[in-house]
Design a protein with these regions (language model features):
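Juxtamembrane intracellular "pre-TM" segments in multi-pass secondary transporters
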Residues: 1, 181-216, 416-422
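Helix-loop boundary and gating motifs at the non-cytosolic
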Residues: 1-47, 210-249, 318
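Hydrophobic core of transmembrane alpha-helices in multi-pass small-molecule transporters
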Residues: 12, 81-82, 91-111, 115, ...
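Loop-to-transmembrane helix entry
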Residues: 34-45, 125-133, 158-165, 237-256, ...
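Helix-to-loop junctions at the C-terminal end of transmembrane segments
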Residues: 52-66, 149-153, 258-271, 361
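Structural signature of the two symmetry-related core transmembrane helices
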Residues: 69-83, 273-288
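Multi-pass alpha-helical transporter architecture, strongest
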Residues: 85-86, 171-182, 347, 376-417, ...
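A membrane-interface helix-boundary motif in multi-pass transporters
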Residues: 147-169, 359-389
Length: 425
């Protein structure tokens, strides 16, 4: 099997694993008698894990172990943890296992990115073609756990623990396949101490002004972006869209198209403009949701346009962000740098977004009594999200000054390395 095919299959299974359990988890937990608060904490596991684990694993991988071997170990551990989590019937038994599983899974996002980056000749050209298989994997997991069983005449498996068992099996599969991936050895031989283990050496990248602006804007953007994942399905259903869950997959299909088109856009317009376009389209998407409804053809079309813009905003910002980080990070800390952006976005940013969105919907946008069939002031919520993203876009446009021909790896000399390891007082 050619290297590109191996990397594509790796990315397919990586995102199939997450999609298999994440989308339908609330159905099984609610049917099993878990409270709304317990379900919320269960979904927060990935954000908590993204804070605790990726940089640690990235720093160890950068120094000691080949990335594909670390991937294999994490996948095997995750398979066991998810299998046992699927057997639980109480929150006290389920939550610790799901959190432990998430701690094994979230670092693999950065690991698979690093393995792909290290084994393609042209990152800007080749990575989007490989990463698009992750989106296809996510869609495939939805089909496997949603439509396919019913099409074959079986009962719906979404409200059961079967999607979790599928996740466990898929994790074991990728664990085995990882040993057949291209060897991606550690790039650094520096001293290992507690600061390096915690990934604090990657924080030295923040001394670069443009990288700091990028990092800060990525963190802020993750908060309003989380509103889409939490509320879009409920909003679309409440305003009258039938089978909203199915129609929302249009966002993933548009993601495939724009992922494949990403090399053209980055070459033609440059990384800064593509990142900015990702922010702008996210704000426009929420703008469509402000005025969307199922009452008229035009307002109904706005709902679909908002869904389709998800692919544009996600690809143009976050996929481009991973490419930018790979360009900026020195070779010996690229995995840790990918972990840093995962920590920033899927970790702190998403967790704060989930909490902010939930509190605002409960305290500010919930109607005491239904108004025109709506239980929430959805327009107010989407307006807040759109304005927040627009402000982030303006900040990014003003303060991020790096052009494509200036994007080079941040120089880290021996003194910098000594500082991160506590050898210079």
């Amino acid at each position: 099997m050619k290297t590109t095919a191996k990397l594509s299959f790796m990315m397919f299974v990586e995102w199939f694993i997450w999609g298999a359990w994440f989308v339908s988890l609330w159905l099984w937990l609610s049917k099993s008698g878990f409270s709304a608060g317990e379900i919320g904490w269960s979904y927060a596991c990935t954000a908590i894990a993204a804070i605790l684990s990726p940089i640690l694993v990235g720093s160890i991988t950068d120094r000691f172990f080949s990335a594909q071997k670390v991937l294999a170990v994490l996948m095997f551990a995750g398979a066991l943890l998810m299998y046992f989590a699927a057997q639980q019937t109480t929150f006290a038994g389920f939550f610790p296992l799901l959190l432990a599983y998430s701690l094994t899974y979230m670092p693999t996002i950065a690991l698979t990115n690093s393995i792909a980056f290290a084994n393609v000749p042209d990152v800007e050209r080749d990575f989007p073609r490989i990463r698009v298989m992750g989106t296809i994997g996510w869609i495939a997991s939805g089909l496997a756990c949603g439509f396919l069983p019913q099409m074959l005449g079986y009962a719906d498996i979404s409200p059961t623990n079967i999607p979790l068992l599928i996740t466990a099996g898929s994790s074991a599969l990728l664990g085995v396949f990882a040993f057949f991936l291209p060897d991606t050895p550690p790039k650094s031989t520096g001293k290992m101490d507690i600061k390096v283990m915690l990934g604090l050496d990657a924080l030295i990248l923040l001394r670069d002004k443009n990288f700091l602006v990028f990092f800060f804007c990525s963190f802020l953007f993750a908060m309003p972006l989380a509103f889409y994942y939490i509320f879009a399905n409920g909003y679309l259903t409440e305003v009258g869209m039938k089978n909203a869950t199915g129609w929302m997959t249009l966002g993933q299909f548009s993601e495939i198209f724009f992922m494949l088109a990403l090399p053209f856009f980055t070459k033609r317009f440059g990384i800064k403009k593509v990142l900015l376009l990702g922010l702008v389209t996210a704000a426009i998407r929420y703008g469509f949701f402000i005025y969307g409804s199922a009452d008229e053809y035009f307002t109904y079309a706005l709902l679909f346009l908002g869904i389709l813009l998800h692919g544009v905003s996600y690809d143009f910002y976050y996929v481009t962000a991973y490419i930018y980080v790979d360009k900026k990070a020195p070779v010996h800390m690229r995995t840790a740098a990918q972990g840093l952006i995962t920590l920033c976005c899927q970790g702190f940013g998403s967790l704060l977004g989930y909490r902010l969105g939930g509190v605002m919907m409960e305290k500010m946008f919930a109607y005491p009594e239904p108004v025109n069939g709506l239980t929430f002031n959805w327009s107010g919520m989407w307006t807040f999200g759109a304005v927040m993203i627009a402000i982030i876009a303006v900040l990014f446009m003003i303060f991020f000054r790096e052009s494509d021909n200036e994007i080079t790896a941040i120089k880290v000399d021996d003194r910098d390395i000594a500082l991160t390891q506590g050898e210079v007082k």
